Amino acid sequence: MLDLRMSSAVKVRVPDCLPGRLPDMELVGYLERWCLAPRSAGGNLYLHHIIAGDEAVVHDHPWDFQSEILEGGYLEMTCDGPVERRKGDVFSKRAEALHYIMTVRPGTWTRITTGPKTRD
């Protein structure tokens, strides 16, 4: 069972029994993802445990999204250069925004809210 008593900064109410990690959404050695609400075409809510950087794999997403750093943090490479993401940061990204995660602090957890899919 996932212990979300990481700090008072964690403000999500997690159900008593989290759904299992979604195997199709797990990037082995990099990211573990839990669905916090039923998946829908209008958007989704996820809890991410980021384990390691993206190995310099520049990518975008099929949807706009908002991220909140709940614990830890990471260094992200963007088209405008590196950006340090820290505990408490909340930011939004457009689907077409290219980026990758360079380095990750141990114990990094984020809450991701996606919008509807806008492209493949």
Task: List each language-model region with its residue ranges.
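Short, conserved beta-strand element in jelly-roll/cupin
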Residues: 60-75
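Short, charged/polar surface micro-motifs in flexible loops or helix N-caps
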Residues: 41-43, 52-54, 71-75
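Substrate-binding/catalytic groove segments of enzymes
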Residues: 75-77, 120
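A short, N-terminal "cap"/entry segment at the start of jelly-roll beta-barrel domains
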Residues: 1-44
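A generic "structured core" feature
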Residues: 59-60, 64, 85, 93, ...
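Conserved short histidine dyad/triad with adjacent acidic residue
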Residues: 44-61, 95-96
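Short acidic-glycine-tyrosine-enriched beta hairpin
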Residues: 77-100
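Ligand-binding loop in jelly-roll beta-barrel domains
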Residues: 94-120
